[in-house]
C-alpha cells in the first residue's frame, strides 16, 4: 500500500538476532555483522537500494508493492496527476476533487467556457470533463440536434410537426408548442453537416474517439463549426458505437444459445435412437397334453365324445385313456414337454380330423350293427 511518509530504517547487530534473519530483497539468510530493518523486515546493506535509480538508501525510503524507492523517484512515478492537464501535483499544492479525479485549482474549470469553478458552484462531471450548469443545459439541447447517422440530414424545428397529436387534439397547429415541450422556449434550427465536415469528423474519430481540446478546436476551425458542436458530435458518435457493439454482442449470444440448444436436442435424439431396440415378436406356441404312449389307434382317445354304448357308460373311452398318466407319480420334467411347434400342430389336426365326420361314421356303424 502507498505510505504517506518515509519508512523508518534501523540498524541492528547480527549477533542480536536469535535466529539468522532472511533478507527481504534477495531472500537469502543474513550472516553480516550489521543488517537493515524496514517496516519489520530485514535487508542486507547492499540490497537496500532504490528500485528505480539503484542508489543506496541510508536515511529514508518509500515502500510500495514490496519495492523500495527514494523520494525523488517515488514522487515521479507514483505522485498524483491532475485530471485536467495530466501534470504532477506537488504535495504542497492545494487541489480540487470531483469524485475520483484530482485537479489543480487553475485546471478546475468548465471545458466549454473555461470559467473557473469555485466552491459551491454547480457542475457536471461527464466523461472526465467538467461542465458548468449553463453549458450542460445547452448541451442537452444540442444532443438532439446533431445526428451521427450516415446521412446526417437534420430537419429544422418547424418540421417536427409531423409527430402524432396529443390525446384530445384532432390536429396540431404549426404555431403551437411541441409535444410536452415548453412553448416559451425559442425554436432553434438543427445543425446540418456537409459531406466534407462529416468526412473530417469520421477521420478524426477513427484516430481517437475522444479527442483533446486542441483537436476539437482544429476541427472547428477547419469545418467552420463551433467547438461545442464538434464535441457533441463526438459524444453522439461514441454513444452510437457503444449501442451497435452492444447489439452485436446480444445477437452473437442469441445465435450461440440457439446453436447450443439444437446440438443438445440432436444429441438427445441420437441417444434415444441408439438405446431403442425393437422386441422380437413372440412365437406362437400351443400347449397340448402329452399323447398316450400306447399304440391304440382308437379315434375316441383323442378327446372326442362318442355316443354312449350299452354297457360302456362307465368307461366310454376304454381302459387306455388320454388322461391315464395324470394321476400317476410321473410328471413333466421341463416346460419343453408341454410345447409343440407349428409343424406339430398341423400333424395333430390331420390325425384328429373333423369331429362331425367322425360322429357320422360312428352313427352309421352303430345302426349297421
Curated annotation (Swiss-Prot):
GO terms for cellular component: nucleus. It holds the Pfam family LIM. Its main location: nucleus. Keywords: Activator, Developmental protein, DNA-binding, Homeobox, LIM domain, Metal-binding, Nucleus, Repeat, Transcription, Transcription regulation, Zinc. The keyword Nucleus applies. Residues 186-245 bind DNA. Residues 23-73, 82-135 form the LIM zinc-binding domain. Residues 143-196 are annotated as: Disordered. SMART domains: HOX (SM00389), LIM (SM00132). GO terms for molecular function: DNA-binding transcription factor activity, RNA polymerase II-specific; metal ion binding; RNA polymerase II transcription regulatory region sequence-specific DNA binding. The keyword Transcription regulation applies. PROSITE patterns: HOMEOBOX_1, HOMEOBOX_2, LIM_DOMAIN_1, LIM_DOMAIN_2. Transcription factor involved in the regulation of podocyte-expressed genes. Essential for the specification of dorsal limb fate at both the zeugopodal and autopodal levels. Interacts with DHX9. This is LIM homeobox transcription factor 1-beta. It comes from Mesocricetus auratus (Golden hamster). The gene is LMX1B.
